[in-house]
From Swiss-Prot:
It catalyses: 5,6-dimethylbenzimidazole + nicotinate beta-D-ribonucleotide = alpha-ribazole 5'-phosphate + nicotinate + H(+). CDD domains: DMB-PRT_CobT (cd02439). This is Nicotinate-nucleotide--dimethylbenzimidazole phosphoribosyltransferase. Keywords: Cobalamin biosynthesis, Glycosyltransferase, Transferase. The keyword GTP-binding does not apply. The gene is cobT. NCBIfam families: cobT_DBIPRT, PRK00105.1.
Amino acid sequence: MSASGLPFDDFRELIRNLPGPDLGAERAVREREVTLTKPAGSLGRLEEIVAWLATWTGKRTPQVNRPLVAVFAGNHGVTAKNITPFPPSVTAQMVENFAAGGAAINQICIANDLGLKVFDLALEHPTGDITEEAAMDEHTCAATMAFGMEAIAGGTDLLCIGEMGIGNTTIAAAIALALFGGTAEDWVGPGTGSTGELMQRKLAAVRQAVALHQPHLQDPLEVLRCLGGREIAAMAGAILAARMEKIPVIVDGFVASAAAAVLYAANPEAIDHCMFGHVSAEPGHRKLLAKMGKEPLLDLGMRLGEGTGAALAANIVKAAALCHSGMATFEQAGVSASK
């Protein structure tokens, strides 16, 4: 903890002083790219992906050998406002399903040869109801960010982050509204299937929460504390830890992007090592990506969460790295280069 004793101070300092890009590694990748047996630029965005990998790993021949999906699960007091068709007990039940191998993310990890870790964030203790009180105090929020930083402890060279938490699209919408303005209608979507009266209650909850905490919302970390959730705080911590350790990150959908948005609002360069795996069918996600100037890799109409979109995108990143490292040059293959 910093000398001032305030838990957020260390994170503010970290966010201000993040390691920058390795432009030498990026340059080396781009120089090799034009020598490979293909017309220049013909692999399109794959060529940009491998340059991004080099930039943030510092490796001139980037590889992805230990990709990991980290799924963070949290519960939210605001679900007491009857904003979702599923009870909060489903969060713990889905964590058990992940452990048993029965969820969509398990199958995608098997198909794409990805590691999977699931983090249960005090599910028996939901965060505060954001329409009545702050989600967390500063100590809890900072400690949860620090816990999220441990996601990379076992070693990985590509981190995919996702989440599970009944009610957390409401939380993500409140964060987006607080950070980027607009109206609740701009950010609130159906989530797990809220329609009709449920949707109206969800909209009302977001409006009420942002109005209640307005005096604190000039500071992005205070936005996280007042309106966030444990899984969102942990994802923000994981993104920061990955940056410190030169690990590129693939962010999943709307809720995971809300965690990235907190860091972006504090320092737009804080998420330069992040790629966004897909754009969710949750309507606020496309707007959120646009606010951060990010282009998703995939658009498959998905809105499940669990890290599924990030995990699917990981295979594209793996393929980009292999194309760069494994392809022969024109000289090696005896193929005539373009004039």
